[in-house]
Amino acid sequence: MFLGEYEHTIDDKGRLAIPARFRDALNEGVVITRGFDKCLMGFPRSVWEELARQVSSLPIGSEETRQLQRMLFSGAADMTLDRQGRILIPQNLREFAELGDQAIIAGLNRHFEIWAPRRWQNVLSAMDANASLFAQKLAELRF
């Protein structure tokens, strides 16, 4: 389970330390790919394989399906953590997410996201502005 928000440095080689609390869930490997809203998404390999099966089962006659498959699969990088608990984010993915020397790693339960700090601040501002909508969603769940 991925929970919390962490700020970490990206070194000159593009390596990013994964939060210690996330590492056990990534022992089997991690897949990083393009995410929504110009971030990156990270998945444990088993969760990625489940998602890939489901997305691959969608009808390819649909333009939306093809675009989703391109977004997820064409930029995906399958990797393992190094001894220091870091991953090497490929240059094309760093450029996509506009990552510099800092990144925010945000846990989202079954996966995590990697954000440029400036973009993450915009996400937090939007969440604040939509708090009442989120409360309604929780009410729909009878929570």
UniProtKB/Swiss-Prot annotation:
GO annotations of cellular component type: cytoplasm; nucleoid
Record's subcellular location: Cytoplasm, Nucleoid
Annotated InterPro entries: MraZ, MraZ_C, MraZ_dom, MraZ_N, MraZ_sf, SpoVT-AbrB_dom, SpoVT-AbrB_sf
GO biological-process terms attached to the record: negative regulation of DNA-templated transcription initiation
Superkingdom assignment: Bacteria
Domain spans labelled SpoVT-AbrB: 5-47, 76-119
Keyword Cell division carried by entry: no
CDD domains given in the database record: MraZ_C (cd16321), MraZ_N (cd16320)
Keywords: Cytoplasm, DNA-binding, Repeat, Transcription, Transcription regulation
One annotated GO molecular function: transcription cis-regulatory region binding
Regions crossing the membrane: none
UniProt similarity note: Belongs to the MraZ family.
Subunit structure: Forms oligomers.
PANTHER family tied to this protein: TRANSCRIPTIONAL REGULATOR MRAZ (PTHR34701:SF1)
Listed name of the protein: Transcriptional regulator MraZ
Source organism per UniProt: Roseiflexus sp. (strain RS-1)
Organism phylogeny: Bacteria, Bacillati, Chloroflexota, Chloroflexia, Chloroflexales
